[in-house]
Swiss-Prot record:
InterPro entries: Isoprenoid_synthase_dom_sf (IPR008949), Squ/phyt_synthse (IPR002060), Squalene/phytoene_synthase_CS (IPR019845), Trans_IPPS_bact-type (IPR044843), Trans_IPPS_HH (IPR033904). Catalyzes the reaction from prephytoene diphosphate to phytoene. This is Phytoene synthase, chloroplastic. Pathway: Carotenoid biosynthesis; phytoene biosynthesis; all-trans-phytoene from geranylgeranyl diphosphate: step 1/1.
Length: 422
């Protein structure tokens, strides 16, 4: 395994410690300081060109989501492709996501072939650089501890290098989400997101903008993390700016991948696959995708129906609402009827299928990484339980997991984390 390139930092560099003081820079355009540059290794190619026209592609049954092929769920995701009126090939959401998963898995498999095992790459650093990086990672840890307390506690069992890398990824994702959901969301435009993506590309080339970027720039030199899931998350933010309805689950699934499934793909290269795992790399990444979606999209979407409606947004499949005899007006009115309860039961059932799929993959992760993942899975599952306990009123009641239940989840998650691949 080759050594990572040296990290060079000027002695007079000044990095802002602010967690989220980046909105002005995004609006005005990135101003990357030359004094803080990570030498680029250019290891990771841009794996997916969104404008590429895909040819016929067959899916292995091992890699398919059985949960997406159950009957009775309206718009089933399939891998078929249909020509649109312009003569171009229209690709299903599953097809698009599948290609990203396969590319990420291939990247890690190449790493495994060259290194024998997936491990952290050692760095040669200048003395002043190390203290700055430690400060950057510490700040990421503080942000994670403040906004994701239970997950942060779970990371305490991870090795220091993996722990810091996960913190850096978490902070970047949070900052990205804040662009469209934070207090300054009304000022964010598509151009601002383009600038944020340009800043991401600079980061992956070893040119971070600020302290928190520096932590992630260091992380991507140590682990085989691909830029595409990060770009796809930004694409999810673009969807939030231009789209407030989803006509079927295929559309919604693609959105869920962008804003949540990407997190699973970002994290697995850092968390690592258990040495004793007999599962294929592709199947582990397939489960990682389900993990990211399960931990974020369905619970949050179903919990926040009322809140989203007050913002004029409906993150539910329009065709399935119609099949249930419901309309946008019913949601805006916040009526909890039998039709709504039956609709929600089906949505929760599908969400739990994502959790079931994700749990299969957790067993294949590196032992030290399983605890925070199990903690998140158990807690987000309970959001669905709380929606049921509220009699499916997610218009006026916000389902949340009590502090006591969060504390109880930690030892349970730890116990499950001890179980490895069968």
């Amino acid at each position: 395994m080759s050594l990572a390139s040296s990290l060079v930092v000027s002695s007079n560099v000044e990095l802002s410690p602010s967690s989220f003081g980046f909105l002005d820079s995004v609006r005005d355009g990135p101003q990357i300081p030359d004094s803080f540059r990570f030498s680029s290794r250019n290891r990771v190619p841009n794996l997916i060109n969104k404008k590429q026209k895909w040819g016929n592609h067959s899916h292995s049954t091992e890699l398919k989501y059985p949960i997406l092929h159950e009957s009775g769920y309206g718009s089933v995701i399939v891998a078929s492709m249909v020509a649109n009126p312009a003569g171009e090939i229209a690709v299903s959401a599953e097809q698009k996501v599948y290609n990203v998963v396969m590319k990420q898995a291939a990247l890690v498999k190449r790493q495994l072939r060259t290194a024998g095992e997936l491990d952290v790459k050692p760095d040669i650093v200048l003395p002043g650089t190390l203290s700055l990086l430690n400060e950057a990672y510490d700040r990421c840890g503080e942000v994670c501890a403040e906004y994701a307390k239970t997950f942060y506690l779970g990371t305490m069992l991870m090795t220091p290098e993996r722990q810091k890398a996960i913190w850096a990824i978490y902070v970047w994702c949070r900052r990205t989400d804040e662009l469209v959901d934070g207090p300054n969301a009304s000022h964010i435009t598509p151009t601002a997101l383009d600038r944020w993506e340009a800043r991401l590309e600079e980061l992956f080339q070893g040119r971070p903008f600020d302290m928190l970027d520096a932590a992630l720039a260091d992380t991507v030199t140590k682990f085989p993390v691909d830029i595409q899931p990060f770009k796809d998350m930004i694409e999810g933010m673009r969807m939030d700016l231009r789209k407030s309805r989803y006509k079927n689950f295929d559309e919604l699934y693609l959105y869920c991948y962008y804003v949540a499934g990407t997190v699973g793909l970002m994290s697995v290269p850092v968390m690592g696959i258990a040495p004793e795992s007999q599962a294929s790399t592709e199947s582990v990444y397939n489960a990682a995708l389900a993990l990211g979606i399960a931990n974020q999209a369905p619970p949050n979407i179903l919990r926040d129906v009322g809140e989203d409606a007050r913002r004029g947004r409906i993150y539910l499949p329009q065709d399935e609402l119609a099949q249930a005899g419901l309309s946008d007006e019913d949601i805006f009115a916040g009526r909890v009827t039998d039709k709504w309860r039956n609709f929600m039961k089906n949505q929760i059932k599908r969400a739990r299928m994502f959790f079931d799929e994700a749990e299969k993959g957790v067993l294949e992760l590196n032992k030290a990484s399983r605890w925070p993942v199990w903690a998140s899975l158990l807690l987000y599952r309970q959001i669905l339980d709380e929606i049921e306990a509220n009699d499916y009123d997610n218009f006026t009641k916000r389902a949340y997991v009590s502090k006591a239940k969060k504390i109880l989840a930690l030892p349970m998650a730890y116990g499950r984390a001890l179980l490895g691949p069968s």
